[in-house]
Amino acid sequence: MTKQVLPLIEKIPQSIVGFLESSSYHWSSSLSKTTQAHARILKSGAQNDGYISAKLIASYSNYNCFNDADLVLQSIPDPTIYSFSSLIYALTKAKLFTQSIGVFSRMFSHGLIPDSHVLPNLFKVCAELSAFKVGKQIHCVSCVSGLDMDAFVQGSMFHMYMRCGRMGDARKVFDRMSDKDVVTCSALLCAYARKGCLEEVVRILSEMESSGIEANIVSWNGILSGFNRSGYHKEAVVMFQKIHHLGFCPDQVTVSSVLPSVGDSEMLNMGRLIHGYVIKQGLLKDKCVISAMIDMYGKSGHVYGIISLFNQFEMMEAGVCNAYITGLSRNGLVDKALEMFELFKEQTMELNVVSWTSIIAGCAQNGKDIEALELFREMQVAGVKPNHVTIPSMLPACGNIAALGHGRSTHGFAVRVHLLDNVHVGSALIDMYAKCGRINLSQIVFNMMPTKNLVCWNSLMNGFSMHGKAKEVMSIFESLMRTRLKPDFISFTSLLSACGQVGLTDEGWKYFKMMSEEYGIKPRLEHYSCMVNLLGRAGKLQEAYDLIKEMPFEPDSCVWGALLNSCRLQNNVDLAEIAAEKLFHLEPENPGTYVLLSNIYAAKGMWTEVDSIRNKMESLGLKKNPGCSWIQVKNRVYTLLAGDKSHPQIDQITEKMDEISKEMRKSGHRPNLDFALHDVEEQEQEQMLWGHSEKLAVVFGLLNTPDGTPLQVIKNLRICGDCHAVIKFISSYAGREIFIRDTNRFHHFKDGICSCGDFW
């Protein structure tokens, strides 16, 4: 308090002075008393004193009257740091961070340098706003004022850099800190763990030991959580073992943090050891531990462990039930998962968004796509709002069965609840539209995304690859390389697959070599499969076979399947038999191999061999997988089976087929009987061909949609040559765009032409 203002203070009633100086006025006084005190101060002329003004600012701020507090500050001719710091502290406490920065700027323009009390508040503001550049400037100010070595300033500066994701700057501050504590060390350990920097974690732990700072269980839990959340699962397990060797007793948080990593690494034996420890420590009653244990067994494929643990848990708790449903679904027991979900509903258990998302995802991942769509609708009727995880879990179901109407509705929902900025939602939309034949909409979604990660780029490349648009895929890849993102093995799978669709052999070899030479990505089985397909389709079957023999690991069924399919295209019986023999050994119960080899024999007129294959299938009890197609009409998905005569509209479908058949004969088209059984009459062969599920679905669509409406059909098998020719004709005859997605690729029929160029 200045000497000049003392006489003025004496004119203020002692009750007002006592009110302002009371340590409890923030909590016990009233706003009216503050305004009265302000009036008395103005009357006495003591308003210019920094101490009195600071007290007024604090008092007004206590009632969130920040405008009044700021007016007091602005009325001071020569404000002090104390006056500014009072308002900065109050605004920061009220989480008005932007205003805090504004007051700091005014303080700095007055030539006032923040002290060790103001700086921690300012660094906190920068941390909350992720305002790294402003924080860096304040760091410079602290260096100029010599306060950068103050313990409180260093601590707040360190946490600011951590919150802004500037690990390098945070580490520099940490290394200069003279007063490190376990909290600061733990924060740095956790951050390095999230980045998977095991060596740095070990180095800091060593430095802590040298400095006499002992890591506590919170430190270890932070490390485990960091490794787990960043996907560095093996590092998490290594660190868990280190904790145990150091003599620490892992608690329920430690166990819950490491178990997801154990499951993702499929370390079942380690999981069992932890299970034993959990029993010994009496942690089985903890719902988080039980959930993590069930999740671990689910990821490790140990179904008995899932069911046994769930049955041991006495309470019906949402988290445990969610883990149980997810574990069952992950292991193909989706019917059991649905049964349990219905049981939970009957017991009026409070099912949250995680519960619904778990069962929807389980259905979508296990071929229960229609059930997934129904559950999504039921979820909303129940008043549970889907979130950024639910939408990406449900959209694959729309794509799997080409439920474009449902997909668009879900897209609209995502727009209404402002989820489009989420990269997972965006990626799922890109994939859904691509699978529904609307690759142009995939491109639009991609272009509108404010932020794109590698998954988004891969989804778009895969979509165009699925449609056989190799030039577009290569163009997208070139754009990807101009970003800071690095392509991964999935990126190159899309590239190689696209090259294979259109026979770009040179480009395929270029990308195959690029992935290892420029990006250090070792080719996987899927890359070799794509190359075999590419070479085989280009007529270089021997080169494809040589590549298989040179593989650094054993080829799988996908690789041999690619060779066998290429042999079908090139009518090469010798290599087909070699590939088929390998497939018989790898997948003895897969009827597709027998059927494909039989078709190759039939194309060569080798009917004795065809009979031999059929007899072999019969002796093994194998039957050709029945053809099945799906089409969406008026927001409802219909399933049509090959040769099914029980369909309610079968008479109208047959009549329409006869009409189309007559028109085709007029134009000179004859059925391709190579795709029918050879040992039946020609008329019966034709009837069998017209009974193929994709034809039934297309004709059903013609009957039940307005003229000009595009048709979208999904088939569970590869489209045959006769169906391909017929649907080409229908697209011209009926004036329809028809999208067919089979197991190999997309076929876009328009005006009698197919996007595949009749080569698939």
From Swiss-Prot:
Q: Which UniProt keywords apply?
A: Repeat
Keyword Hydrolase listed? The answer is no
Q: Which InterPro entries would you find in this protein's record?
A: DYW_dom (IPR032867), E_motif (IPR046848), Eplus_motif (IPR046849), Pentatricopeptide_rpt (IPR002885), PPR_At4g14850-like_plant (IPR046960), TPR-like_helical_dom_sf (IPR011990)
Outline the segment boundaries, as ranges, of region: Type E motif: 559-634
BP term (GO), one = RNA modification
Region (Type E(+) motif) residue spans: 635-665
Region entry Type DYW motif, spans: 666-760
Return the similarity comment.
Belongs to the PPR family. PCMP-H subfamily.
Q: What is this protein called?
A: Pentatricopeptide repeat-containing protein At1g20230
The organism encoding this protein is: Arabidopsis thaliana
Question: What is the gene name?
Answer: PCMP-H21
